[in-house]
């Protein structure tokens, strides 16, 4: 077993947590490797641990999706929908991993196709303006024209992402186990533009009617659409294997996090 550790060292407790993890792994004679932005796609591991917040875990979604890796997020950030609150008991958490005393919570991913590229996102794929100008985007569902949006952009969110950017843009909250896409316009120039919730067999195409539209995958710019180009999105057959050390009730977590 080789454990990969990906840490956000801008978080105050990250170094301390990393040292504790490494100490336990060494005592148990478990191989480990410290991952970073440069080597994360090339190193081979069997299990992944992230140290930070939800954003740190989102940073490794592409890797865990492509390699079908289980991932444990240890929270030392602010928002912790996806990560575990075990920073004060690292030895307990790592021992449970070594003993296979955990369960997997599968989360749906949205898969985006553009030219010869494929992007995987746990929260959302966004098409967003690159300047201060409003942009025009045409939405097609299963090749049928559905709507044209004159707005700051469009969010294509998973159920997991429905409590993230999509929620801030006025989208609905969806239970995380549902394999749906939530299409939410960003600051639309029309009162009739509303969110759409689409089933897991739908294929969405978004055509850019404007130049220089940014493609943003889980908060990171992935590419740019030019006028007339399409981005295709669907629920992926790949899923994120999120490691849980104890059962969590979605509505209890939601209530606590929305209060923050």
Curated annotation (Swiss-Prot):
It catalyses: NAD(+) + ATP = ADP + NADP(+) + H(+). GO terms for cellular component: cytoplasm. Keywords: ATP-binding, Cytoplasm, Kinase, NAD, NADP, Nucleotide-binding, Transferase. The keyword Ion transport does not apply. The active site is at residue 54. SUPFAM superfamilies: NAD kinase/diacylglycerol kinase-like. Its cofactor is a divalent metal cation. One of its GO terms (molecular function) is ATP binding. Its main location: cytoplasm. It is found in: Cytoplasm. Its EC number is 2.7.1.23. GO terms for biological process: NAD metabolic process; NADP biosynthetic process. Gene3D superfamilies: Probable inorganic polyphosphate/atp-NAD kinase, domain 1 (3.40.50.10330), Probable inorganic polyphosphate/atp-NAD kinase, domain 2 (2.60.200.30). NAD(+) binds at residues 54-55, 123-124, 150, 152, 163-168. InterPro entries: ATP-NAD_kinase_N, ATP-NAD_kinase_PpnK-typ_C, NAD/diacylglycerol_kinase_sf, NADK. Coiled coil: none annotated. The keyword Transmembrane helix does not apply. HAMAP family: NAD_kinase (MF_00361). Belongs to the NAD kinase family. Involved in the regulation of the intracellular balance of NAD and NADP, and is a key enzyme in the biosynthesis of NADP. Catalyzes specifically the phosphorylation on 2'-hydroxyl of the adenosine moiety of NAD to yield NADP. This is NAD kinase. It comes from Caldicellulosiruptor saccharolyticus (strain ATCC 43494 / DSM 8903 / Tp8T 6331).
């Amino acid at each position: 077993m080789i454990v990969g550790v990906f840490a956000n060292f801008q978080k105050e407790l990250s170094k301390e947590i990393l040292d504790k993890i490494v100490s336990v792994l060494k005592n148990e004679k478990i191989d480990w490797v410290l991952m970073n932005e440069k080597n994360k796609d090339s190193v081979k591991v069997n299990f992944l641990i992230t140290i930070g917040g939800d954003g740190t875990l989102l940073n490794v979604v592409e890797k865990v999706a492509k390699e079908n890796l289980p991932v444990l997020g240890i929270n030392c950030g602010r928002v912790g929908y996806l990560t575990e609150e075990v920073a004060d008991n690292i030895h307990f958490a790592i021992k449970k991993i070594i003993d296979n005393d955990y369960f997997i919570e599968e989360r749906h991913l949205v898969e985006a196709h553009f030219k010869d590229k494929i992007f995987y996102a746990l929260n959302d794929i966004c098409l967003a303006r690159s300047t201060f100008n409003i942009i025009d985007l045409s939405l097609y569902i299963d090749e049928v024209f559905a709507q044209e949006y004159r707005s700051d952009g469009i969010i294509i969110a998973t159920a997991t992402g429905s409590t993230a950017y999509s929620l801030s843009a006025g989208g609905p909250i969806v239970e995380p186990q549902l394999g749906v896409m939530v299409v939410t316009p960003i600051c639309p120039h029309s009162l009739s533009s509303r969110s759409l919730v689409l089933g897991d067999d739908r294929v969405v195409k978004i055509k850019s009617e404007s130049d220089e539209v940014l493609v943003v995958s889980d908060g990171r710019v992935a590419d740019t659409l030019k006028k007339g180009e399409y981005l295709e999105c669907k629920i992926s057959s790949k899923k994120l294997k999120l490691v849980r050390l104890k059962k969590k009730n979605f509505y209890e977590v939601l209530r606590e996090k929305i209060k923050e």
